[in-house]
Amino acid sequence: MRDMEELCPSALLMNYVNPMAANSIGMGMASKIPFVGLCHGVQTTLDLIAGYVGEKKEDIDFVAAGINHMAWFLKLEKDGADLYPKFREIFERPEYFINDKVRGETMRHFGYFMTESSGHLSEYLPYFRKNQKALDLYCDQPGFGGASGAYYYFCDMLARKYQEVDYLSFEKGDLTPRSKEYCSNVIEAMETDKIFRFNGNVINKGYIANLPDGCCVEVPMFADKYGLHPESVGKLPQQLAMLNQMDVSVQLLAAEAALKGDPELLFAAVAADPLTSAVLTLKEIRDMVAEMLEDQRQWLPQYEGKSLRTLDIIPTPAGLEGVAVPLDPALAIVHRFGKLADN
């Protein structure tokens, strides 16, 4: 982005790099370069939904909005008829539910389907990976269906397979048909004024009213020769905003920690993570972050010379008497109950 500020300050940066939301927030904090984050979650999930309900995706009128990897299909209609009742009924059938357990269970409890695979979604919420029972119930499918470390092992395998490849000579010169990714369509729209509608990731400026301004949201928008035009969707259903906000807090903290090189903010970001906090104590989280920071320091120059504070467990052996202090109001009530019980 620094190079773009010098060489092409009005050009659009299209980002595909994860973590999409945290990266986007960081870009918004660090630079004035216009950017959009592009993902394939909405369009590929629409294909999936169309198959489930037996409709052509071109015939489905939909609105999707939220945050990257956790946007919600707020509307699913065909010719004005709501497709959600049929879709929800389908996911009550075991032969369908087994294909997408985490997304299906989330929809069953909160009412809406979201845009990321079950394996990915299980990483963003505190409900599905917190213990072995939950893993066996919801994350028992191979690969991205829930297997631990699936994304890492897949990327590592590809990196090893192609580490000696010259990519410029590896790819054929012939143009292949367009994929489901948005990038070339956005470029075409901006160069030819052929309007293209899609979902993109941008800094929230009231586009989703019940998520904080300054976070990264994934909302409907269109591109034309004048640029990008994000659309406001109003308020998400409150339960969906609650689920999004769990990870928005992590993303805001992570971006600020990265830009400032602040180990304590880094710890706070990890401590705020819903899955981490579901399985670890604060002391365990602090020790883990300290270890990870040391192991990855060579790639994190902004943390040079900085370390996380060490906080040991304060011992409170059996029989230890606390000092005399004014009673906390809640403890005072308990104390009063005790007196009443003794009388």
Residue ranges and their predicted role:
Residues 1-5, 50, 187:
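Generic structural signal for well-ordered alpha-helical scaffold segments
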Residues 1-31:
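Rossmann-fold NAD(P)-binding glycine/threonine-rich loop
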Residues 13-17, 37-39, 198-199:
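A structural signal for short, well-ordered beta-strand segments and their strand-loop junctions
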Residues 18-21, 40-41, 65-67:
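An acidic- and aromatic-residue-enriched active-site/binding cleft used to recognize and process polar
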Residues 25-29, 48-49, 74-76:
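Short acidic, glycine/serine/threonine-rich loops at helix termini
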Residues 29-35, 80-81:
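A glycine- and small-aliphatic-rich helix-loop capping segment at beta-alpha/alpha-beta transitions
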Residues 33-53:
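Acidic, His- and aromatic-enriched active-site or binding-groove loops in soluble protein domains
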Residues 51-340:
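Long, compositionally biased stretches enriched for glycine and/or charged residues
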